[in-house]
Every structure is written in structure tokens, then in C-alpha cells.
């Protein structure tokens, strides 16, 4: 094979590897964020207390569930 064909094959392989790696990393990050949201009930409790509210545990859990629900809805909307 000529040198030009080898160079072309190397460029194609590197490009395919780059795009494959980006795709796999993106899917793993989406899965991780979906399973373990960055905002925890403790963080919600702290934010509410900083805003001067005295939140009940039911209010914190309701807010947390709404955030998780919105996160999952955004993930499924993005997959379409």
C-alpha cells in the first residue's frame, strides 16, 4: 500500500476513535447525573434556610422529587 493510503487510514481511525470516545463519555455522564443528581436534600435544606425559610422535611422531599422529576423529563426529551 502506498504511504497516502496509510496516512488516510490513520486519520480515519483517529477521527472515528475521537467521535466514539466523545459519544461514550457523553452517555456515561448523562447516566451518572440521572442516577445521582448534584442537588441533594441537604443542599436544598441549606438553601432554604439561607433564604430565611424554615422548611419542613415534607417540603424538602417534595422539592427534591420535583427536581429529580424535571431532570428525568429533560433527559428523555433530549433523547428524542
UniProtKB/Swiss-Prot annotation:
The chain crosses the membrane at residues 4-24. GO terms for cellular component: plasma membrane. The keyword Cell membrane applies. InterPro entries: UPF0154 (IPR005359). Its main location: membrane. It is a single-pass membrane protein. It is found in: Cell membrane. The keyword Cell membrane applies. Keywords: Cell membrane, Membrane, Transmembrane, Transmembrane helix. HAMAP family: UPF0154 (MF_00363). Belongs to the UPF0154 family. This is UPF0154 protein Sez_1648.
